[in-house]
């Protein structure tokens, strides 16, 4: 066949488009991906027929599917579908705006060429939805936004005496505009148009307009333009140097006799949000969940927002400072970012330099903008990511990873994970069951194998040894922690020795305790821990641990508890899948009664239900995957938010929250896969939060897809993954738009933008030189001095009891129980399979 990449890419459209037709034919309404694929693949078939023009297909694309054929929120989330195909006269772009614009569409077009039966319209009842239930809905405060509020302004009369139109942007020094514009140039010295940042005023030939001018902010140092008023603003120059330059250059000038003060410009909140994103007091619905966030603070400056694009703000002499050296300015600015972090839910520009977040606040040009944060200058060396229609979170940490297959890492990155901690060597039986990279030989191989993967890695050695020699060896070989696992031995003696090594080397211990109760009950394990800090994996117990009451460790200050995601949240199918998962992962045999009893002892509806409650109250502090060993690496983020959504449904708003303001709950849950695992494993000084000094590992989401599929992942300040279209297309938004590895995922770049986390002892022994690795090696630290009190938004320590016969779980005497969910958000609406 000798197909080109662009042809094999489009086969994905055909595959999913055909699948969507089959689903529609049997009466299923389509989700967003299915809808786009069906319309796109049908357009390609019409292009192939060669009987339609580009213009005709732009119209035909609107006449396939109607609102009744797609899921709630799909019409509003698909603004444009674009394809490129080979017409009789070449390859051209077809753009279909608002493709779902009628109730009924025309299924004859949707099924054209498929030979599938066209379903009756009666199968798809139309049901209009209230606006506030739309995916990613935005509710703005009922007030206006005042721009440039505290500055002087006046009305200026302008005429275009030229024979061509002139368009002037918001932050262009008006004095410097086209010589064909006639107005009082001297009066305009030090002023720009009083219009929203990034907008413009157009003057047609011969047209007269009266516009409002507003004084520049900042230091009032001007650069660029035509050079009429360059330098520091000086009132004395208006009638001298500036006047001389205007006359010498032949710039249109007419003195304005009457000068009127202009009114403060006010913007409708909805209009403001459409341009710059939501601001203080505005509320956003997260995906299809009943979770709402409210913007707590906006650090940008109304009227001086950074905005990139043709004729917009970030241009020389405007929002981009002139004459700055590379070291003086940001490498990257993320403009108008809506940040969702444990520290708050707020709006700000984010500045990145050398892969590190160096500023969060207001970026721009301090020469002519107010409020620019120190160290956040935008210059000609600065790249821009427009964050105004996106939500920004810290990259997720998955700290329970079985390194079974390299393919796990692609799935992890695509889901928003930027750091993985765990152990293993591949699909060996030991690694299938436990997260241990057990020898120096394997440690070197695994660190080398992951040296060019764009994720931060940490490897845990085996801590199941009542002697200390092997543990010393593996820590000094690069282990960032130790794993104690019952499959290798989790006896009191083993736990005590492992914790002694952890204290000596300042690393963390991850514990999978003794389900069998072979050496003692949970009390014996707690006695062996002796009040020392430890990370308790899958604290509910289905993933392993003292049956039936390992969950009681949630009450202890020194125990840092986490969940693994197969039980997140408790749903009607949760228990039924667990037996087979458990048997395979831990090498059990269904023909052996004791193995069946062992497995059954770990699967309890009562403790799984209690886990929901304890996650919601902050008694369980973290969520991780246990990937390919009873968990799913690509669902750490998704299942965390499903849990949050379920618990709001069953328990209502948290204290301090409201029905349409869930900021406290959102901060609690985002902390579970960002800051808290970072603190637990001694990494929070560099990752786990959107904070100055941290690595720029950032994930960007649309509000309507929050928690399901990211738009872009930044790894150490470099784009490593993004949703991008056909590589042969004229623009990057042509279908199929797929999550794809970007430049930051290329091997040499990955080594530059990522970290390998190791022990300080291994660095002292010159691990980087011995292993010849390219990644930045960082030592974990402060793993031993932390406790439950340090878990952000997840530090509660209720008195726990578990009835050994009924398995009822009580926290501070209150029964922890919720029913299993039979329907959850972030499910079929978002995923094809």
UniProtKB/Swiss-Prot annotation:
Keyword Metal-binding (UniProt): yes
Induction: Expression is increased when cells are grown on urea.
Lineage: Eukaryota, Fungi, Dikarya, Basidiomycota, Agaricomycotina
Biological source species: Cryptococcus neoformans var. grubii serotype A (strain H99 / ATCC 208821 / CBS 10515 / FGSC 9487) (Filobasidiella neoformans var. grubii)
Quaternary structure annotation from Swiss-Prot or TrEMBL: Homohexamer.
Name listed for the protein in its UniProt record: Urease
Domain (Urease): residue spans on this chain: 395-833
InterPro entries for the chain: Amidohydro-rel (IPR006680), Metal-dep_hydrolase_composite (IPR011059), Metal_Hydrolase (IPR032466), Urease (IPR008221), Urease_alpha_N_dom (IPR011612), Urease_AS (IPR017950), Urease_asu (IPR005848), Urease_asu_c (IPR017951)
Record: residues binding urea: 402, 433, 485, 512, 629
Keywords: Hydrolase, Metal-binding, Nickel, Virulence
């Amino acid at each position: 066949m000798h197909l080109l990449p662009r042809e094999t890419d489009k086969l994905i459209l055909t595959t999913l488009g055909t699948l969507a037709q089959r689903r529609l034919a049997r009466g299923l309404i389509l989700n967003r991906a299915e809808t786009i694929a069906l319309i796109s693949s049908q357009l390609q078939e019409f292009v192939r027929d060669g009987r339609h023009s580009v213009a005709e297909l732009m119209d035909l694309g609107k006449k396939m599917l109607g609102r009744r054929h797609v899921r709630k929120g799909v019409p509003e989330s698909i603004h444009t579908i674009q394809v490129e195909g080979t017409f009789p006269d070449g390859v051209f772009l077809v753009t279909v705006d608002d493709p779902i614009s009628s109730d009924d569409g025309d299924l004859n077009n949707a099924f054209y060429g498929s030979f599938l039966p066209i379903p009756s319209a009666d199968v798809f009842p139309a049901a209009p939805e209230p606006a506030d239930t739309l995916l990613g809905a935005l509710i703005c405060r009922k007030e206006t936004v005042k721009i440039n509020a505290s500055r002087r302004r006046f009305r200026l009369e302008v005429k275009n005496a030229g024979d061509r139109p002139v368009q002037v942007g918001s932050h262009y020094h008006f004095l410097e505009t086209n010589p064909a514009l006639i107005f009082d140039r001297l009066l305009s010295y030090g002023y720009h148009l009083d219009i929203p940042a990034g907008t413009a005023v157009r003057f047609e030939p011969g047209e007269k307009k009266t516009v409002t001018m507003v004084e520049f902010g900042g230091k009032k140092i001007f650069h660029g333009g035509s050079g009429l008023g360059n330098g520091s603003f000086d009132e004395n120059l208006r009638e001298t140097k500036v006047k001389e330059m205007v006359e010498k250059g032949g710039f249109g000038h007419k003195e304005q006799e009457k000068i009127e003060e202009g009114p403060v410009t006010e913007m409708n909140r909805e209009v403001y949000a459409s341009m710059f994103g939501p601001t203080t007091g505005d509320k956003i619905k997260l995906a299809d969940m009943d979770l709402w966030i409210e913007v707590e603070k906006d650090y940008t400056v109304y009227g001086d927002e950074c905005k990139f694009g043709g004729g917009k703000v970030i241009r020389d002499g405007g929002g981009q400072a002139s004459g700055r050296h590379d070291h003086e300015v940001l490498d990257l600015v993320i403009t108008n970012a809506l940040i969702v972090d444990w520290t708050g839910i707020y709006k700000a520009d984010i500045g990145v330099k050398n892969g590190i977040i160096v500023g969060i606040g207001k970026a721009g040009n301090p020469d002519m903008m107010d409020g620019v944060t120190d160290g956040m200058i935008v210059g000609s060396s600065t790249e821009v990511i427009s964050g105004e229609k996106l939500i920004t979170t810290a990259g997720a940490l998955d700290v329970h990873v079985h390194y079974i297959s390299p393919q796990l890492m692609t799935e992890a990155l695509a889901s928003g994970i930027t750091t993985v901690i765990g152990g293993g060597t591949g699909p060996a039986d030991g690694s299938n069951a436990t997260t241990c990279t057990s020898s120096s030989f394997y440690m070197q191989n695994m660190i080398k194998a992951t040296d060019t993967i764009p994720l931060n890695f940490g490897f845990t050695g085996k801590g199941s040894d009542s002697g200390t020699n092997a543990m010393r060896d593996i820590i000094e070989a690069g282990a960032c922690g130790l794993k104690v696992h019952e499959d290798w031995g989790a006896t009191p003696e083993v736990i005590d020795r492992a914790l002694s090594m952890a204290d000596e080397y300042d690393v963390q211990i991850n514990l999978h305790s003794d389900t069998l109760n072979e050496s003692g009950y949970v009390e014996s394990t707690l006695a062996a821990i002796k009040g020392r800090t430890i990370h308790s994996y899958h604290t509910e117990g289905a993933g392993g641990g003292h049956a039936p009451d390992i969950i009681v460790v949630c009450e202890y200050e020194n125990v840092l508890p986490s969940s693994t995601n197969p039980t997140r949240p408790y749903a009607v199918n949760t228990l039924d899948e667990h037996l087979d998962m458990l048997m395979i992962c831990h090498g059990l045999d269904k023909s052996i009664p004791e193995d069946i009893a062992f497995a059954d002892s770990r699967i309890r509806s009562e403790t799984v239900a209690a886990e929901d409650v304890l996650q919601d109250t902050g008694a369980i502090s973290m969520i991780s995957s246990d990937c390919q060993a009873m968990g799913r690496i690509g669902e750490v983020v998704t299942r965390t938010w499903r849990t949050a959504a379920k618990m709001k449904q069953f328990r209502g708003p948290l204290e301090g929250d409201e029905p349409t303001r869930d900021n406290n709950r959102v901060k609690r849950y985002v902390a579970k896969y960002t800051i808290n695992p970072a603190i637990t494993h001694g990494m929070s000084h560099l990752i786990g939060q959107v904070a100055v000094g941290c690595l720029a590992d950032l994930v960007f989401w649309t509000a309507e897809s929050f928690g399901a599929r990211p738009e872009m992942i930044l790894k150490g300040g470099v784009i490593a993954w993004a949703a991008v279209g056909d590589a042969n297309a004229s623009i990057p938004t042509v279908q199929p738009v797929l999550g794809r590895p970007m430049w930051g995922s290329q091997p040499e770049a990955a080594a530059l933008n990522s970290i390998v986390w190791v022990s300080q002892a291994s660095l002292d022994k010159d691990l980087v030189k011995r292993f010849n690795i390219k990644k930045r090696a960082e030592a974990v630290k402060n793993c031993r001095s932390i406790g439950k009190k340090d878990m952000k938004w997840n530090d509660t320590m209720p008195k726990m009891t578990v009835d050994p016969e009924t398995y009822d779980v009580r926290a501070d005497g209150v029964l922890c129980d919720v029913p299993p969910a039979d329907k959850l958000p972030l499910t079929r609406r978002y995923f094809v399979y």
